[in-house]
Amino acid sequence: AMIKTSRLETGVISLEQKQQPVYDTLAAALGGILLNAEKKQIDVQVECPEHLDARHDRKWTSEALFNILDNAVKYTPAGGQIHVSVEGWEMYVKIDIADTGIGISEQHQGTIFKRFYREDAVHDVDGIGIGLYLAREIVTLQGGYIWVVSEVGKGSTFSVFLLRK
């Protein structure tokens, strides 16, 4: 993750945005988390139209979505749920990743996207605090944005907005 972040920031990596289905990009991201979700008996549900396109770089956007999904698995207790839903808006495609995890306090919701940030409550969970930073950088470089709504003890919903055209 560190090398990817460095390459992205220095412009070594260029994002190749093209009009393509979000379905395939999301499927690649989900492929990276399903085994760990299964180990924790987390129910992963996905609602995504097959033919909904957005202008994005498939490889890097998949990486961004994976980072958010990976956190959802890490911070959702065994037996919990992750629900992914995708819908087309006029200018954006909105991808919601909702979990029944530990949640993020309101005071920390603005800082979770900072590089190396880790909330004190999660220091026993593996990670270096760069996944959400990298996810936001990737999405922002493509003209999109990420929004989070969370409640401690109830879970979080990360909304990723990608430009349709």
Enumerate the language-model features and the residues they cover.
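Short helix-loop "hinge" at the ATP-lid/N-box region of the Bergerat-fold HATPase_c
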Residues: 72-73
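Short alpha-helical Gxxx[C/S/T] motif in the catalytic ATP-binding
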Residues: 131-135
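Glycine-rich G1-box
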Residues: 35, 102-103
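Conserved catalytic submotifs in the C-terminal HATPase_c
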Residues: 16-21, 38, 43-53
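Short beta-strand/loop element within the Bergerat-fold HATPase_c
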Residues: 79-91
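Short conserved segment of the HATPase_c
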Residues: 104-116
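Conserved glycine-rich
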Residues: 143-144
